[in-house]
Amino acid sequence: LEGDGVVIKGTKKRLEFHRYQVCEDIINLSKTRRKRVQAKEFVSLSRLDALQEIKAYLANTYDLSNTLIISNADGGAGYAKKDFDEIVGYCRQHEHFLDVFHLNKKIKDRLSFMPAMQGKLISAVEFKYDRHLTDVILDTIESNLIDELNTPENHENLRRLRSYLHRRWVDIKTFKMRHLSVIKAIGCCESNTYRVKGQGKYWSEDGAEGILRVLTCIKNNELEYWLSSEFAGGQLDIGDQEELKGAVRANL
């Protein structure tokens, strides 16, 4: 179970669409290609709408009382473990992971003033998962904030990074260290992000919502069913047909 938010260009302001995706397993098609089993995606400009859709799908499709749930997200607003607890409801076990891509980016962004320490901190946090060593490295960085590095901005970035790592320490623990009896099937959400944001377009809210709905149905193999339903007629407002064609081509 994964989720993320993606910002796209809007005609009046930036728009953010929210996506949750779920699958039962991942199988290897080749050395470089994997396929999700029973994958479903739920996307909307409204996080609450997407959240309610995936909650309803899980409740109506699965009995999770004896199921291990593995979730993965960037930890932003609406994507913390408690949010996924709400989606899942009652289950046998829920293991939540902080997305490694976003963790690395956070460390590099916050330590942009001291690149030489980025790799050391990433190693201590992700590969060794050593809380004491992590604190030692952070203390070392702080002690080296002298001369031109001794700025309020650098001190604030370091303080915020330390707080970020402490708050999310449990979620940072690696898949291998948790000794789970399943294969790693997370980390797909970022790589599967729709190319709507790469179309060079400025989307209206109605146009973006309509195209996201169509693309989600394509991903879920439900387009024909959805377009023939009464629900589609009141929700679909594509606008520019060229926008639709470009976005669809990018996702086929």
Predicted regions and their residues:
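Acidic/histidine-rich catalytic cores and adjacent linkers
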Residues: 56-93, 100-252
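RNase H-like nuclease fold core
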Residues: 1-70, 77, 82
